[in-house]
A protein has these predicted regions:
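Short acidic-glycine-tyrosine-enriched beta hairpin
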Residues: 30, 70-92, 185-214
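A short, N-terminal "cap"/entry segment at the start of jelly-roll beta-barrel domains
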Residues: 2-38, 42-48, 68, 75-163, ...
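Surface loops and adjacent helix of pleckstrin homology
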Residues: 69-71, 111, 184-188, 220, ...
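Sequence termini and other peripheral, non-core segments
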Residues: 171-172, 196-216, 223-237
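Residue-level recognition of short, solvent-exposed, well-ordered loop/turn junctions
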Residues: 42, 61, 80-81, 151, ...
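Short, conserved beta-strand element in jelly-roll/cupin
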Residues: 51-67, 165-182, 186
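A short beta-loop-beta micro-motif enriched in histidine and acidic residues
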Residues: 43-57, 73-74, 153-172, 193-202
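Asparagine-centered strand-capping/turn motif at beta-strand->loop junctions
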Residues: 50, 95-103, 165, 175, ...
Length: 237
């Protein structure tokens, strides 16, 4: 079989777009290393066939109940609770699929990592964060993902209303619950030092630089506030 024949046979026989151009996958911002995508489906809605080519960290903003059909496979349910986080390495699977929502809307924020495989730097020498309110969800060469939980619970000696970390790299914070917080992010570059009081809504995001990071809960109507921290721009020491 010739190379041309092989390419023709392997090419999908459907119309599809790259995820960058799928209308329900809306880009919020893009840097050299990260693309932040807000994915929202009304009930009973089917998106276009589309392909993912990068590593993705998916943060579920509301209970998820959709049907996902990868190209060449049968449809399969994708059901997740609010606050769930799942990671997919599309540099490997080159996922081409279509998704259909059910009775409820679908709402996901994706932290899409844009680094090529050859540019990913191992971070096995970087210490994993260990503090009250911090849970490691994912540890792969491309990124580390943590769940930060802020709450004032006198019955739980591990609960905390403030978390302080030393970020080894640039990071993205995605908000799961409406809240007011004070955020400090002090980097080696004095020009980008920040200290601010923020009123954050579900699915909001905050871009962070390497350096000292502190988040303090000011108020919320929720018993606990959760935020997802993705560290994703490791560099060689």
């Amino acid at each position: 079989m010739s190379e041309t024949e092989a390419q023709t046979m392997s090419k999908p026989d459907i119309d599809y777009v790259l995820v960058d151009f799928e209308p329900l996958h809306k880009q919020r911002w893009r840097s050299e290393t990260v693309r932040l995508v807000c994915v929202q489906f009304p009930p009973h809605t089917r998106c276009l066939w589309h392909q993912h080519l990068n590593y993705g960290v998916y943060v579920v903003m509301a209970p998820l109940d959709v049907m996902e059909q990868p190209y060449g496979q049968q449809p399969r349910p994708l059901v997740k609770d609010k606050g769930s986080v799942f990671c997919r390495d599309h540099t490997i699977d080159k996922l081409l699929h279509v998704v259909t929502s059910a009775e409820t809307p679908a709402f996901i924020v994706e932290v899409e990592l844009l680094k090529k495989k050859e540019d990913v730097v191992a971070h096995d020498q970087v210490v994993i964060h260990n503090a009250n309110g911090v849970e490691l969800l994912n540890d792969e060469p491309e990124c580390r993902v943590y769940r930060l939980t802020l709450q004032d619970d006198a019955s739980d000696d591990k609960s905390t209303t403030e978390i302080s970390l030393e970020l080894p790299t640039g990071a993205v914070l995605v908000v799961l619950d409406d809240c007011e917080v004070e955020i400090t992010n002090v980097s080696e570059n004095a020009e980008v030092d920040t200290e601010c009081h923020k009123s954050l809504k579900v699915a909001d995001d905050v871009q962070l630089t390497a350096g000292k990071f502190n988040v303090k809960l000011v108020s919320s109507n929720e018993k606990k506030v959760q935020l997802i921290l993705t560290e994703c721009d490791y560099t060689k020491v």
